[in-house]
Protein backbone atom coordinates (compact mmCIF):
# COMPACT_ATOMS: atom_id res chain seq x y z
CA UNK A 1 0.00 0.00 0.00
CA UNK A 2 1.20 3.50 -0.84
CA UNK A 3 0.07 6.61 1.04
CA UNK A 4 0.24 9.62 -1.31
CA UNK A 5 -0.32 13.22 -0.23
CA UNK A 6 -1.76 15.76 -2.67
CA UNK A 7 1.62 17.52 -2.92
CA UNK A 8 3.47 14.35 -3.94
CA UNK A 9 4.55 13.68 -7.53
CA UNK A 10 2.57 10.44 -7.61
CA UNK A 11 -0.68 12.22 -6.75
CA UNK A 12 -2.94 12.34 -9.85
CA UNK A 13 -2.96 15.87 -11.25
CA UNK A 14 -6.57 15.29 -12.38
CA UNK A 15 -7.64 15.07 -8.73
CA UNK A 16 -5.95 18.34 -7.78
CA UNK A 17 -8.16 20.20 -10.25
CA UNK A 18 -11.58 19.07 -9.02
CA UNK A 19 -13.83 20.78 -6.48
CA UNK A 20 -13.21 19.33 -3.01
CA UNK A 21 -9.99 17.48 -3.94
CA UNK A 22 -8.79 14.76 -1.55
CA UNK A 23 -5.88 15.69 0.69
CA UNK A 24 -4.44 12.20 0.39
CA UNK A 25 -5.03 8.90 -1.32
CA UNK A 26 -4.10 5.31 -0.59
CA UNK A 27 -3.33 2.97 -3.46
CA UNK A 28 -2.36 -0.62 -4.07
CA UNK A 29 -0.65 -0.99 -7.43
CA UNK A 30 2.46 -2.41 -9.07
CA UNK A 31 2.17 -0.02 -12.00
CA UNK A 32 0.96 3.34 -10.69
CA UNK A 33 3.12 5.65 -12.80
CA UNK A 34 2.04 3.96 -16.03
CA UNK A 35 -1.61 4.25 -14.99
CA UNK A 36 -1.14 7.95 -14.28
CA UNK A 37 0.25 8.46 -17.78
CA UNK A 38 -2.55 6.53 -19.55
CA UNK A 39 -5.92 7.83 -20.79
CA UNK A 40 -8.67 6.83 -18.38
CA UNK A 41 -12.39 6.27 -18.90
CA UNK A 42 -14.88 5.84 -16.07
CA UNK A 43 -17.48 3.16 -16.84
CA UNK A 44 -20.45 3.02 -14.48
CA UNK A 45 -24.11 2.07 -14.35
CA UNK A 46 -26.84 0.00 -12.78
CA UNK A 47 -26.12 -2.50 -10.02
CA UNK A 48 -28.83 -4.69 -11.56
CA UNK A 49 -27.59 -4.84 -15.13
CA UNK A 50 -29.86 -6.31 -17.79
CA UNK A 51 -28.52 -8.58 -20.53
CA UNK A 52 -28.46 -5.49 -22.77
CA UNK A 53 -26.37 -3.60 -20.23
CA UNK A 54 -23.98 -6.52 -19.92
CA UNK A 55 -23.49 -6.85 -23.66
CA UNK A 56 -22.90 -3.16 -24.41
CA UNK A 57 -20.60 -2.71 -21.41
CA UNK A 58 -18.37 -5.62 -22.38
CA UNK A 59 -18.33 -4.66 -26.06
CA UNK A 60 -17.44 -1.00 -25.46
CA UNK A 61 -14.86 -1.75 -22.77
CA UNK A 62 -13.07 -4.26 -25.00
CA UNK A 63 -13.01 -1.73 -27.82
CA UNK A 64 -11.40 1.08 -25.83
CA UNK A 65 -9.03 -1.15 -23.85
CA UNK A 66 -7.60 -2.29 -27.18
CA UNK A 67 -6.48 1.32 -27.66
CA UNK A 68 -4.70 1.49 -24.31
CA UNK A 69 -7.49 3.13 -22.31
CA UNK A 70 -7.55 2.33 -18.58
CA UNK A 71 -11.03 1.58 -17.20
CA UNK A 72 -12.04 3.26 -13.92
CA UNK A 73 -15.01 2.07 -11.88
CA UNK A 74 -16.20 1.44 -8.33
CA UNK A 75 -15.97 -2.36 -7.82
CA UNK A 76 -19.73 -2.45 -7.16
CA UNK A 77 -22.21 -5.06 -8.31
CA UNK A 78 -23.56 -4.84 -11.83
CA UNK A 79 -21.99 -2.58 -14.45
CA UNK A 80 -18.95 -1.71 -12.28
CA UNK A 81 -17.76 -5.28 -11.88
CA UNK A 82 -18.66 -6.06 -15.50
CA UNK A 83 -16.43 -3.17 -16.63
CA UNK A 84 -13.52 -4.31 -14.46
CA UNK A 85 -13.84 -7.92 -15.64
CA UNK A 86 -14.18 -6.93 -19.30
CA UNK A 87 -11.00 -4.85 -19.06
CA UNK A 88 -9.13 -7.75 -17.45
CA UNK A 89 -10.48 -10.21 -20.00
CA UNK A 90 -9.29 -7.94 -22.81
CA UNK A 91 -5.76 -7.88 -21.42
CA UNK A 92 -6.13 -4.30 -20.22
CA UNK A 93 -5.78 -2.40 -16.97
CA UNK A 94 -8.41 -1.07 -14.62
CA UNK A 95 -8.63 1.08 -11.49
CA UNK A 96 -11.16 0.38 -8.73
CA UNK A 97 -12.04 3.40 -6.57
CA UNK A 98 -13.25 2.28 -3.15
CA UNK A 99 -15.68 3.81 -0.61
CA UNK A 100 -13.62 2.30 2.22
CA UNK A 101 -10.09 1.54 3.33
CA UNK A 102 -8.01 -0.77 1.15
CA UNK A 103 -8.38 -3.49 3.77
CA UNK A 104 -12.20 -3.24 3.75
CA UNK A 105 -13.11 -4.41 0.24
CA UNK A 106 -16.80 -3.83 -0.53
CA UNK A 107 -18.70 -5.85 -1.44
CA UNK A 108 -16.74 -8.63 0.29
CA UNK A 109 -17.57 -10.99 -2.55
CA UNK A 110 -15.36 -8.87 -4.84
CA UNK A 111 -12.20 -9.47 -2.81
CA UNK A 112 -10.96 -11.86 -5.50
CA UNK A 113 -11.70 -9.34 -8.26
CA UNK A 114 -9.77 -6.67 -6.34
CA UNK A 115 -6.75 -8.96 -6.16
CA UNK A 116 -7.00 -9.74 -9.88
CA UNK A 117 -7.03 -6.02 -10.67
CA UNK A 118 -3.77 -5.45 -8.80
CA UNK A 119 -2.18 -8.60 -10.23
CA UNK A 120 -3.00 -7.40 -13.76
CA UNK A 121 -1.08 -4.15 -13.11
CA UNK A 122 -4.17 -2.10 -12.34
CA UNK A 123 -4.87 -0.36 -9.04
CA UNK A 124 -7.11 -0.01 -6.02
CA UNK A 125 -7.55 3.62 -4.95
CA UNK A 126 -9.26 5.28 -2.00
CA UNK A 127 -9.14 8.50 0.00
CA UNK A 128 -10.00 6.57 3.17
CA UNK A 129 -7.40 5.29 5.61
CA UNK A 130 -7.13 1.59 6.51
CA UNK A 131 -9.91 0.10 8.63
CA UNK A 132 -12.46 2.65 7.34
CA UNK A 133 -15.72 0.83 6.64
CA UNK A 134 -17.97 1.89 3.74
CA UNK A 135 -20.40 4.36 5.31
CA UNK A 136 -23.35 5.44 3.16
CA UNK A 137 -21.94 8.94 2.51
CA UNK A 138 -18.65 7.46 1.33
CA UNK A 139 -20.26 6.04 -1.80
CA UNK A 140 -21.35 9.45 -3.10
CA UNK A 141 -18.05 11.07 -2.11
CA UNK A 142 -16.18 8.25 -3.84
CA UNK A 143 -18.02 8.96 -7.08
CA UNK A 144 -16.34 12.36 -7.46
CA UNK A 145 -12.97 10.56 -7.57
CA UNK A 146 -14.19 8.10 -10.21
CA UNK A 147 -15.09 10.98 -12.52
CA UNK A 148 -12.25 13.18 -11.34
CA UNK A 149 -9.40 10.86 -12.26
CA UNK A 150 -10.96 10.05 -15.66
CA UNK A 151 -11.01 12.00 -18.91
CA UNK A 152 -14.68 11.15 -19.46
CA UNK A 153 -17.50 9.19 -17.85
CA UNK A 154 -19.45 6.49 -19.72
CA UNK A 155 -22.82 5.35 -18.37
CA UNK A 156 -23.91 2.17 -20.11
CA UNK A 157 -27.18 1.52 -18.26
CA UNK A 158 -28.93 3.47 -15.50
CA UNK A 159 -32.44 3.84 -14.15
CA UNK A 160 -33.98 7.25 -13.52
CA UNK A 161 -32.88 7.25 -9.85
CA UNK A 162 -29.55 5.45 -10.31
CA UNK A 163 -26.59 6.41 -8.15
CA UNK A 164 -24.66 6.73 -11.41
CA UNK A 165 -26.39 10.07 -11.91
CA UNK A 166 -24.41 11.43 -8.94
CA UNK A 167 -21.24 10.61 -10.84
CA UNK A 168 -22.62 12.27 -13.97
CA UNK A 169 -23.28 15.44 -11.98
CA UNK A 170 -19.76 15.37 -10.53
CA UNK A 171 -18.37 14.94 -14.04
CA UNK A 172 -20.26 18.00 -15.28
CA UNK A 173 -19.02 20.06 -12.33
CA UNK A 174 -15.49 18.95 -13.16
CA UNK A 175 -15.83 19.84 -16.84
CA UNK A 176 -15.68 16.22 -18.00
CA UNK A 177 -17.60 14.71 -20.91
CA UNK A 178 -20.60 12.58 -19.96
CA UNK A 179 -21.09 9.76 -22.47
CA UNK A 180 -24.25 7.68 -22.42
CA UNK A 181 -25.43 4.52 -24.16
CA UNK A 182 -29.06 4.91 -25.28
CA UNK A 183 -31.41 2.09 -24.35
CA UNK A 184 -34.86 0.78 -25.25
CA UNK A 185 -37.59 3.26 -24.36
CA UNK A 186 -39.48 0.38 -22.73
CA UNK A 187 -36.61 -0.41 -20.36
CA UNK A 188 -36.68 1.11 -16.86
CA UNK A 189 -32.98 0.32 -16.48
CA UNK A 190 -32.18 2.65 -19.38
CA UNK A 191 -34.57 5.48 -18.43
CA UNK A 192 -31.82 7.43 -16.67
CA UNK A 193 -29.53 7.10 -19.69
CA UNK A 194 -32.19 8.26 -22.12
CA UNK A 195 -33.01 11.21 -19.90
CA UNK A 196 -29.33 12.25 -19.75
CA UNK A 197 -29.19 12.21 -23.54
CA UNK A 198 -32.30 14.42 -23.73
CA UNK A 199 -30.51 16.84 -21.41
CA UNK A 200 -27.41 17.08 -23.57
CA UNK A 201 -25.16 14.12 -22.74
CA UNK A 202 -23.25 12.60 -25.66
CA UNK A 203 -24.89 9.44 -27.06
CA UNK A 204 -22.50 6.54 -27.64
CA UNK A 205 -23.11 3.60 -29.96
CA UNK A 206 -19.56 2.31 -30.56
CA UNK A 207 -16.07 2.26 -29.09
CA UNK A 208 -14.99 4.58 -31.90
CA UNK A 209 -17.41 7.22 -30.58
CA UNK A 210 -15.63 7.08 -27.22
CA UNK A 211 -12.15 7.14 -28.75
CA UNK A 212 -13.11 10.23 -30.75
CA UNK A 213 -14.11 12.05 -27.55
CA UNK A 214 -10.84 10.96 -25.91
CA UNK A 215 -8.95 12.01 -29.06
CA UNK A 216 -7.40 8.56 -29.44
CA UNK A 217 -6.78 6.86 -32.77
CA UNK A 218 -4.35 4.41 -34.32
CA UNK A 219 -3.79 0.70 -34.03
CA UNK A 220 -4.54 -1.48 -31.07
CA UNK A 221 -2.22 -1.19 -28.07
CA UNK A 222 -2.99 -4.79 -27.14
CA UNK A 223 -1.49 -6.90 -29.89
CA UNK A 224 -1.90 -10.64 -30.51
CA UNK A 225 -4.23 -10.78 -27.52
CA UNK A 226 -7.27 -13.02 -27.28
CA UNK A 227 -9.93 -10.92 -25.58
CA UNK A 228 -11.78 -13.37 -23.32
CA UNK A 229 -13.86 -12.70 -20.22
CA UNK A 230 -13.64 -16.32 -19.04
CA UNK A 231 -11.98 -19.66 -19.80
CA UNK A 232 -14.82 -20.90 -22.03
CA UNK A 233 -14.56 -17.84 -24.29
CA UNK A 234 -10.78 -18.26 -24.38
CA UNK A 235 -11.01 -21.93 -25.44
CA UNK A 236 -13.32 -21.11 -28.33
CA UNK A 237 -11.46 -18.00 -29.52
CA UNK A 238 -8.09 -19.73 -29.17
CA UNK A 239 -9.37 -22.66 -31.24
CA UNK A 240 -10.52 -20.26 -33.97
CA UNK A 241 -7.33 -18.17 -33.91
CA UNK A 242 -5.62 -20.51 -36.41
CA UNK A 243 -8.54 -20.58 -38.83
CA UNK A 244 -12.23 -21.26 -39.36
CA UNK A 245 -13.74 -24.45 -37.91
CA UNK A 246 -16.96 -26.38 -38.25
CA UNK A 247 -19.25 -26.48 -35.24
CA UNK A 248 -18.27 -30.09 -34.47
CA UNK A 249 -14.53 -29.47 -34.83
CA UNK A 250 -14.73 -26.33 -32.71
CA UNK A 251 -16.65 -28.20 -30.01
CA UNK A 252 -14.05 -30.96 -30.03
CA UNK A 253 -11.05 -28.62 -29.90
CA UNK A 254 -12.54 -26.44 -27.17
CA UNK A 255 -12.97 -29.46 -24.86
CA UNK A 256 -16.06 -27.81 -23.35
CA UNK A 257 -19.19 -29.69 -22.34
CA UNK A 258 -22.10 -29.25 -24.72
CA UNK A 259 -24.18 -26.87 -22.60
CA UNK A 260 -21.29 -24.50 -21.88
CA UNK A 261 -20.14 -24.67 -25.51
CA UNK A 262 -23.57 -23.76 -26.91
CA UNK A 263 -24.10 -20.97 -24.39
CA UNK A 264 -20.68 -19.46 -25.06
CA UNK A 265 -21.01 -19.75 -28.84
CA UNK A 266 -24.37 -17.97 -28.71
CA UNK A 267 -23.01 -15.19 -26.50
CA UNK A 268 -19.91 -14.65 -28.68
CA UNK A 269 -22.13 -14.46 -31.77
CA UNK A 270 -24.60 -12.02 -30.17
CA UNK A 271 -21.78 -9.74 -29.01
CA UNK A 272 -20.14 -9.70 -32.44
CA UNK A 273 -17.03 -11.71 -31.59
CA UNK A 274 -17.60 -14.59 -34.01
CA UNK A 275 -20.00 -15.37 -36.86
CA UNK A 276 -21.22 -18.35 -38.87
CA UNK A 277 -20.13 -18.36 -42.53
CA UNK A 278 -22.20 -20.94 -44.35
CA UNK A 279 -22.26 -24.65 -43.70
CA UNK A 280 -22.15 -24.05 -39.94
CA UNK A 281 -18.53 -22.83 -40.08
CA UNK A 282 -17.38 -20.39 -37.39
CA UNK A 283 -14.92 -17.53 -37.88
CA UNK A 284 -13.57 -14.73 -35.68
CA UNK A 285 -14.76 -11.25 -36.63
Roles of regions detected by a PLM:
Residues 1-285:
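Glycine-biased, small-residue-rich flexible motifs in mid-sequence functional cores and linkers
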Amino acid sequence: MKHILNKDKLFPTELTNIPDPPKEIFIESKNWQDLLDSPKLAVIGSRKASSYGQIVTEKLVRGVVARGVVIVSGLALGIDSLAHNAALGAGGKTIAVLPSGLDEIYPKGHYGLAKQIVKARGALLTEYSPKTVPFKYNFIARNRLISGISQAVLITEAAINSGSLHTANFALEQGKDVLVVPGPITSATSAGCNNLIKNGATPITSADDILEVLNISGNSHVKNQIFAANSAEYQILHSLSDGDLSNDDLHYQSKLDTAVFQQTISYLEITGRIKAVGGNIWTII
